[in-house]
Structure formats: C-alpha cells, structure tokens
C-alpha cells in the first residue's frame, strides 16, 4: 500500500510540474485602433483625390482582419476589394505589395505565394509598422500603380508620430 501511495504521489508531482512547464502566459501585442485605421484610410483617399483619382482604401489589423474600407463615391466597386487584398498582402508578407510583386515574379521558389487566398501582387499596399513589428496594412486602389503606392504611404505618414 505504501508503494502504491508513493507511485500516486510521484505521478501527481510529475503532472503538476509538467503543467507548469508548458503553461503559457499572456501575450501582449500592439494593434491598430479603429480611430487610427480611419485616419489612415481617409488620408490615403485624400491624397489620391488631390491628384484627381477616385479610389478606395482599406486598413487591416495585425491579424489581417479589416478595420476600415472607404471608397470614394465616384470609384468603381471593384477597387474596394482590390484595396482590401493589397492591405492584407502587405500585412501578411510584411512588405510593400510592389516589393512582393517583384520578388514573386523573379523567384520561382516563392511565385506560388501569389495563388494564396486574398493575395494581390499589385502595388498599392504598405505594411503599417511600429519599429520592426508589423501591426497592420493599408491598401490603395483605383489610380495608377505608382500613385496607389504614394497614396498608401501618405496614409501612413499621417499617423507616423503615433507609430513610434
């Protein structure tokens, strides 16, 4: 009987110790607020509108989930979806969609990444970063490709002081 109690006690101790060793703590992460996302999207559209383009802008959070999609009243409907996919691509790959487009066009080892769901390899998407931490993405669609990039950058620039 004493032997059995020792075995049970040993098992109980092992379970308790192993449970503590594998327990996970709370994970703290930075994320975009809805207010900041709206500011970025509005500044993105305003920049393109000032150049005569009718565009859409989308902002996604660190998980790639949409926070904001805005479409100029004169923009065509498909540009909102394009903006969302550009924002998602920039967030997921932590780089501009222009760089993603170049990399996947020249490297056969990663070319298949273009075929993943919701990925769009066209310029106009920018990651939103705090230091090296990518906390979201912004996408602009509806102008020419160079201008879409500039508009997305302008959106991020509007909140640059808050991203430090």
Regions found by a protein language model. Give the residues of each.
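Flexible, solvent-exposed loop/hinge segments and secondary-structure transition points
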Residues: 23-164
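N-terminal secretory signal peptides that target proteins for export/translocation
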Residues: 1-4
